[in-house]
Amino acid sequence: MTNVTPMMQQYLKIKSQYQDCLLFFRLGDFYEMFFEDAKEASRVLEITLTKRDAKKENPIPMCGVPYHSAESYIETLINEGYKVAICEQMEDPKTTKGMVKREVIRVVTPGTIMNQGGMDEKQNNYILSFIKDGATIAVSYCDVSTGELKVTKFNDESMLLNEITTINPNEIVAADQVSESLKQQMSLATETITVVDEISNEAYEVNQVEDTLMHQAVQLLLDYIHHTQKRNMNHIEDAQVYEAIDYMKMDYYAKRNLELTESIRLKSKKGTLLWLMDETKTPMGARRLKQWIDRPLIYKQAINERLDAVSQLIDRFIERDTLRNYLNQVYDIERLVGRVSYGNVNARDLIQLKHSIAEIPNIKALLDDFDDALPEQFRQLEPLNDLLDLLEKSLVEEPPISVKDGGLFKQGFNQQLDEYLEASVNGKQWLAQLQAKERERTGIKSLKISFNKVFGYFIEITRANLKGFEPADFGYNRKQTLSNAERFITDELKEKEDIILGAEDKAVELEYQLFAQLREEVKAYTERLQKQAKLISEIDCLQSFAEIAQKYNYVRPEFSDDKTLDLVDSRHPVVERVMDYNDYVPNDCRLDDDQFIYLITGPNMSGKSTYMRQVAIISIMAQMGAYVPCGSAVLPIFDQIFTRIGAADDLVSGKSTFMVEMLEAQKALTYATEDSLIIFDEIGRGTSTFDGLALAQAMIEYVAETSHAKTLFSTHYHELTTLDQSLECLKNVHVAANEYQGELIFLHKVKDGAVDDSYGIQVAKLADLPDRVIERAQVILDAFEEKDKPQPQISHLQQTESFVREPEIEDIQDKKEPETEQFQQGAFDLFETPPVESEIEAELKKINISNMTPLQALNKLSELQNQLK
């Protein structure tokens, strides 16, 4: 680019170093953006796009935002997935000759936000790194705002996506190029993926991580954080090594289907298990609760420690209520400490910190009064009286937001500051006396002494009072003329102004220095404060468990040694809350080593899916250490929960409903153990009747022979109910419904035995389908029912051959049923179809839906619709 100004050369040089960012380039009171950055920012921020050098041949696109309100604009860009590099003026333009030095002081990315306004206080803001060495993968993640830092590794690539969707980072840093297929999977969590070419040789203190690959993952993450933030991040904790196998494993689809933290329909917290269980009083407790939901425990001792604490808190209602009041006065200590370390803390933040640590002695005294049922670590709560005293004697109770305008410190904290403030106060008293004296001397009652930053102090007289007034007679020198007034100064006023403003400026400057010193003193307490914050967050979670247990009549779960699951009067905790509690129908469930598969039949809308989900959710709550919605509950400890619930295409990867169903089933069949829980909701409905029936039976048999996992399997293939004759481990149950005077009444009660009717037409009537459709469907159904129904094959488990035997070609040929094909064709012939529709029917028969993506199916449907027009 020719004829570029020196300032624009400076911009282009800096921009070349931050090509993946929008560059906020400081010019005076604005951050300016140029070229493509300006086009992007103006579109997203909805601000005016202008041009620099508009009269030249190639004007430069340009837009800008005021520096004093830039944070809100940055927040908007970050929420849209952009990175923003903040380029500041490093010299005062007023005192600098030539070009002002500028440099990027920080890069704000989705995973490194430190501004409180840009974060949900109840959600962690994680940034994650991963690094691969052959089949081994190390993952490290950090919440820069709180300092939490963890690392793990595993040898199964499928676990990478599980960890990413569990951690749900806002940004991912990779050491190598990421394949498009992996990017698609990662997009379930974030679109912001940064590839770092090399890891810095700069040594960070990660000596506590001995494993080489995990050490590199932490190094990669810290290197990126320091590169973007360009300052010491002393609040980031030592990396905590953890094992993913130490927690119950649930993949993304299981968590989504069970609606643990986000509802499927609204994509919000409301209507989820997190929404139900969140009776926390602190932001730290709310974040900890989500972590506990995402990672239920698998060790009985740790679970029972939590349950013992919950029991104590339930039994002592008055103390729990007092504890909740104390916690309600505690602010977000974790993020306040992060802001102290980062350097963007203000005086109001420190007042919040003061109020928070003032509650620690109260919380400690209350918990010390409990018996030994509370976990031992809660005895480690530490009153930080020395820090409390420091903050109490230093800062005023209601300081201004800005730390550069003074008014922060109490009188008596610093002698020099007191002297400056006294000079300023005395000077203002003198100004008030001068104003009264001048009013009397001039006889102008409306005369006033005012101040602005341009002219300093001045005497103002309205134009109406200037008639016959001679300023020189009173020693007034004209300073400024306004439309309705004149402004004057006097020698005496000017002399006093220098004294007053000198004292004020010195006081403000000294206060800023004192605040910086105070911030450093508070920073020394970082590790102790973080420890207290962690303990308080755990206490908050446990009292939340106790609160919901007592409020909703939950019971303490027991854990069986023989892997028995026995739930009496179990309820879905969320469903019963969004409906009238008294209307909810509780149900039992018993599975053990001898009978570990429930085959569940019943009409649509009868509650089969709710019943299966509630068993899974109760298991999760129990292993979190919470009470559960049951009359009584005995459970095994599950290592994994697998779900296949609902019908949904995977539009991201172009997989059909049936393919998604099969992939989720594959995970359960491949990885489930005898300690796992499987929930299969109407497997096989995405394909033809015979294919679906065959696959459903084969899956049931596979679980029965291999993993022996506890399994809830709902189906509308009533032919499968005969499997209880060949599989002793399978029990038929059904969700009851009655038909009364042509109307279907759902009882929502799970009873022993099978049903042979799904009441599909009755459910269709409830949906108010046209009467003509209902009547026609009944005629066709009657015709179907006159023919033989397809029957499942005798279970291979009754035969001597192994499950893995592949059928011979002759076996498959022998199973062709031409009579059934003729019957199906005859059933369709019952419709009186016009000729054009017969052609479309023929076209439909050629389509193999199982091999189509959703987009291909929509295109084909559009093509057929056009033929009908």
From Swiss-Prot:
Purpose of the protein: This protein is involved in the repair of mismatches in DNA. It is possible that it carries out the mismatch recognition step. This protein has a weak ATPase activity.
SMART domains associated with the record: MUTSac, MUTSd
Protein's recorded name: DNA mismatch repair protein MutS
Database matches in Gene3D superfamilies: 1.10.1420.10, DNA repair protein MutS, domain I, MutS, connector domain, P-loop containing nucleotide triphosphate hydrolases
Gene name of the record: mutS
A GO cellular-component term linked to this record: cytosol
Xref: CDD domains: ABC_MutS1
Pfam families reported in the protein's UniProt record: MutS_I (PF01624), MutS_II (PF05188), MutS_III (PF05192), MutS_IV (PF05190), MutS_V (PF00488)
NCBIfam families per the UniProt record, alphabetical: mutS1 (TIGR01070), PRK05399.1 (NF003810)
Coiled coil: none
Amino-acid positions noted as binding ATP in the UniProt annotation, renumbered to this chain: G602, P603, N604, M605, S606, G607, K608, S609
